[in-house]
Amino acid sequence: MRKLDLNAVYISERVQETLRPIRASALTAVVAPMGYGKTTAINWFLNQRRQTENAVILRVNIYSDNRSIFWKSVQNAFGAAGLTALAGCEYPEDASSAAQLMDDLCTVLAGNTPCYLFLDDFHLLKDENTAKFLCGLANRLPENVHLIVASRNNFLPKEEILRLGHRLHRIGKEQLRLNHTE
């Protein structure tokens, strides 16, 4: 008899199908209220990618609206993956430094190995400039890099949604909610 694993995570086939396009999207926006399993679903997806693709996974947990703490978390995530490109870099305060950082990130992350950067609890940051930066970055990312942002609130400016076009994958509460057959 098979031993039950009480810590096993159940992800329905329908939700798995919803997650699959992340592999082909530069930016995936996961927006749903608390309790819909955003983090659980993305962590399951990333664990699958690590096992099947040997992907590089960069996780950034956002704890507050403090940009300094956010930036330190980003630097720590890169450092934990052995990527030192952001060590000593300041948070980009203007368009020129943001563009330079985008170029540097694309250069460092480009390659054959799939790379997933997951920003969790983005709603806590409450910074429109960071949202615009992420959209600009998504428009430049090499094909092997995928940005995933989970938030309780919509964070994408309408004009950026249009600019991103097919590079954007959106997952909402309708896709995450379990139905009566699941």
Stretches with model-predicted labels:
Residues 5-19:
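N-terminal pre-P-loop "Q-motif" helix
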Residues 26-43:
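Walker A/P-loop nucleotide-binding motif
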Residues 99-153:
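Conserved Walker B catalytic segment
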Residues 41-44, 50-114, 124-126:
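Conserved phosphate-binding/catalytic loops and adjacent sensor/switch elements of nucleotide-binding enzymes
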Residues 19-25:
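Phosphate-binding P-loop
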Residues 40-44, 132-182:
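Alpha-helical sensor/transducer elements of the RecA-like P-loop NTPase core
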